[in-house]
From Swiss-Prot:
Regions of compositional bias (Basic and acidic residues) in chain numbering: 131-148
Subcellular location(s) per record: Cell inner membrane
Topology within the bilayer: Single-pass type II membrane protein
Functional note: Heme chaperone required for the biogenesis of c-type cytochromes. Transiently binds heme delivered by CcmC and transfers the heme to apo-cytochromes in a process facilitated by CcmF and CcmH.
Binding site for heme: 130, 134
Organism field: Serratia proteamaculans (strain 568)
Family (UniProt): Belongs to the CcmE/CycJ family.
Intrachain S-S bonds: none
Cytoplasmic side: 1-8
Name used for this protein in its record: Cytochrome c-type biogenesis protein CcmE
Region (Disordered): 131-164
């Protein structure tokens, strides 16, 4: 192999290694900023054909309806706990902070946070839904069934969606 070809080969190898390293670092950085959207039933029963459930400690967004009678506020702190339900399940959500003005029982919400032990979502942010007109299509599709399931069908959030 002549020296000119050899130097081009080395340059091509260095460029490929650089591109691979850059792509790996970008994917690693983006991975920590991705929050997947789940409904309560998808957290309890799994999502997709493989029924993949989120892991404890995973960042996620959960969307559903606030179960009537489930909102509990701590009088001494700003901590609030409530249940979010859909047609096939209910999940506990805890949040510390001031809730949006549109937050109320029976209203649609999206909570962003981390999944804790016992399928409890520790939310960092709670968004109250006011109109489905402004909802992304994949979220709107997942939320369509939420209006169908009666909140009284869920005794506890850990009942895996079983009806009483």
């Amino acid at each position: 192999m002549n020296p000119r070809r050899k130097s081009r080969l080395y340059l091509a190898i260095v460029v490929l290694i650089g591109v691979a390293l850059t792509a790996t670092l970008m994917l690693y950085a983006l991975r920590s900023n991705i929050d997947l959207f789940y409904t309560p039933s998808e957290i309890l029963q799994g999502k997709g054909e493989n029924h993949e459930k989120p892991e404890v400690g995973q960042r996620l967004r959960i969307g559903g309806m606030v179960m009537p009678g489930s909102v509990k506020r701590d009088q001494k702190t700003l901590q609030v706990s409530f249940k979010v339900y859909d047609a096939r399940g209910a999940i506990d959500v805890t949040y510390t902070g001031i809730l949006p003005d549109l937050f109320r029982e029976g209203q649609g919400v999206v909570a962003q946070g981390v999944l804790g032990e016992g399928n409890v979502v520790n939310a960092r942010e709670v968004l109250a839904k006011h109109d489905e007109k402004y909802t992304p299509p994949e979220v709107a599709d997942a939320m369509k069934e939420n209006h169908k399931g009666p909140a009284s069908a869920y005794a506890t959030p850990q009942n895996e969606g079983a009806k009483s």
